[in-house]
C-alpha cells in the first residue's frame, strides 16, 4: 500500500494512536533514508540538544505577544485565532474559516470529554476556549508566555461561563509539570522551539 493510500484510509477510518505513530515512524525513516545525507540528521539533533528550549523569547514578546488584545481585534477573526485558518471553498468569512480550522484540529487530535488536555503556546485562546466549550468535563491547561494573552483568555472564559480552563503564564524554557495528560496539543508553536526534545521530555503523557 502506498503512503497516499494509507493516509487516505487513515483519514476515512481513524486508527488508534499507536498504529498512526508506528506508521509515521516508518514513513519518516524511509524519507530520511532517501533525502538526508549520512550523519546530517545526527549532527542536527546534537546541535539542537545543546540549545535552550526556546531562543529569543523576550524579543518575540516585545514584538507582538505583549501587544494589547485590541490591536489584534483589528485583523484577527472573532475567535482571535493567531494561526492559519481553513477555507474549503474559498468563500468562507474569516470567522467561518477560523471555526472550520479549529474543528479540524479538535478532530485530528482525538479529543474527548473528560480528558486532561494541555495546550502549549495557546496564543489568544482560540483552541483552548473551543475545547473548553466543546468538552465541559475536560480539564484544560493552557500555556502562554504573554500576560495580556492570559488576561484576555481568562476574561473570555468568565464571559462564557467556562470553569474547566486554567491558563499558565510561563516561558517555555521554564515550563515543567508533574501532571499527566491524555492529550498535548500545540498549533504553530514548535517552529519557535530550538530544543523540542527537551520540552517534550517535560510534558510527555
Residue spans of the language-model regions?
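N-terminal auxiliary segments of SAM/dcSAM-dependent transferases
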Residues: 2-73
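A short acidic, Gly/Pro-enriched loop at the edge of an enzyme's catalytic core
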Residues: 173-184
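Conserved SAM-binding loop of SAM-dependent methyltransferases across substrates and taxa
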Residues: 124-136
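Conserved class I S-adenosyl-L-methionine
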Residues: 114-123
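A short glycine-rich, Lys/Arg-flanked "PGG" loop and its adjoining helix->strand segment in the class I
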Residues: 197-205
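Class I SAM-dependent transferase core
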Residues: 45-111
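Conserved SAM-binding strand-loop segment of SAM-dependent methyltransferases
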Residues: 159-172
Amino acid at each position: 500500500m502506498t503512503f497516499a493510500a494509507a493516509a487516505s484510509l487513515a483519514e476515512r477510518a481513524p486508527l488508534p494512536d499507536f498504529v498512526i505513530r508506528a506508521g509515521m515512524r516508518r514513513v519518516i525513516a524511509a524519507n530520511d533514508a532517501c533525502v538526508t545525507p549520512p550523519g546530517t540528521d545526527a549532527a542536527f539533533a546534537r546541535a539542537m540538544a545543546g540549545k535552550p528550549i526556546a531562543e529569543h523569547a523576550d524579543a518575540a514578546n516585545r514584538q507582538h505577544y505583549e501587544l494589547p488584545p485590541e490591536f489584534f481585534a483589528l485583523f484577527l477573526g472573532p475567535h482571535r485565532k493567531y494561526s492559519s485558518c481553513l477555507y474549503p471553498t474559498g468563500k468562507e468569512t474569516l470567522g467561518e474559516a477560523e471555526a472550520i480550522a479549529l474543528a479540524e484540529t479538535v478532530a485530528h487530535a482525538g479529543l474527548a470529554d473528560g480528558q486532561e488536555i494541555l495546550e502549549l503556546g495557546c496564543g489568544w485562546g482560540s483552541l483552548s476556549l473551543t475545547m473548553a466549550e466543546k468538552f465541559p468535563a475536560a480539564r484544560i491547561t493552557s500555556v502562554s508566555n504573554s500576560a495580556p494573552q492570559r488576561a484576555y483568555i481568562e476574561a473570555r472564559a468568565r464571559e462564557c461561563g467556562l470553569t474547566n480552563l486554567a491558563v499558565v503564564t510561563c516561558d517555555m524554557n521554564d515550563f515543567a509539570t508533574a501532571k499527566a495528560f491524555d492529550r498535548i496539543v500545540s498549533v504553530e508553536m514548535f517552529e519557535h522551539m530550538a530544543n523540542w526534545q527537551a520540552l517534550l521530555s517535560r510534558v510527555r503523557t
